[in-house]
Amino acid sequence: MKKSLLSFAVLMMGAALFTACSNDDDTPELKKVDVSNGMFVVGSGNKKANIDGNVSYIDYQAGAVTANAFQKANGKSLGKTANYIVDYGSKLYIVVDAEATIWVCDKNTLSVVKQINTIDLLGEKDGVSPRAAVGENGNLYVTFYGDSNNGGNGIVAAIDTVNFAKQTTYTVGSYPDGLTIANGCIYVANSDYGNCKNPSISKIDLGSGKVEEIKDEVITNPMQILTLGSDVYYLDYGTYDASWNQMGAGVRKITASGEVTKVVDGTAMCTDGKKVYTVNAPYGAAETTYLIYDAATGTTTSWNPEGIFSPAVIAADPVTGNIFIVSYQENPETGYPGYALPSYTNQYDAQGKFVKKYENTATGPISVVFNTDVKYVQ
């Protein structure tokens, strides 16, 4: 694991040496090219089976998986209920809800740079249950549920990525989860913990610090949120009946002016920068469908990725456009998804054709991030 990731750092050192050469006319001009080397898969673990949170790394060039990569790199566990991973600059940030911890890791080696105890950083009232994060302007912005004394609202905390100190906090809506940045603002999906009484989208103006609440009848249980162009798309889990059948789940679009519309069904989503890909597997439904929403045309098509038993996460490589679906494997004893078993990940090209299957990825898969960077070529 360390060797394959360190080779990337050596490549970048070589690129730096090239750019430091003389500016003679004979010196070839180097072009900056985006590259993608692999994918980190975070699993929340499994509480019933006493399995901690975990990270696996898929190395494209080697065509192999390093399971429990964090533990192998650091000799310790992530802790209970890992929830999210994001890269910003040269670091990875892994959010662990039940431990009130954010692990700051070197992107090339997964070695821990800093363990941020969020209760120590923010206090008992605000630092409970970190959920998701995004990096911008030298800060890591993190959503927190907070404790029961916070008046029903969560917070977003800005944490400096050099000294890892608190910069400021913003009060947002009830049980904030995913967040994204668009048009100089942070948009936050306030899930209300699925109670469907006070869900909303918070909009934080990073210039003024003003927080606005967006409410609409189609905002019922927002969880994940992303940016595509100047618009924001969020995944709403919808509602559940008395038998826990899931209804009304799908992706909604929020325009820069605040208009909210439902665009496509889904229970998981990702974007390649042009389209929104969804898995539509509502709890209690007889079948799973896979949909593609084209943001430019407003049209929806379907596809049928082969080899998926029980999808958990879908993600698009921002460089190659390849689509990855992380799936639970079948429990051979029950025929149901093996929630305490390692997942597997299928790779498809941009046209939806199967490319490769990676075994033994994370247990309890919940979040992924791609190992991307740049290289310089003639």
Task: Indicate where each model-derived feature is located.
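Repeated scaffold domains used in trafficking and secretory/extracellular systems
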Residues: P28-E29, S77-V86, G123-G135, V172-N183, ...
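Short glycine/acidic-enriched loop and turn motifs that connect beta-strands
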Residues: G45-N50, E99-T101, G146-G151, D192-C196, ...
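Bacterial Sec-dependent N-terminal signal peptides
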Residues: M1-F40
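Acidic, serine/threonine- and glycine-rich low-complexity intrinsically disordered segments
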Residues: V162-A285
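Post-signal peptide N-terminal segment of secreted/secretory-pathway proteins
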Residues: A49-N137
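Residue position within the beta-strands of beta-propeller blades
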Residues: V41-V42, I94, V142-T143, V188-A189, ...
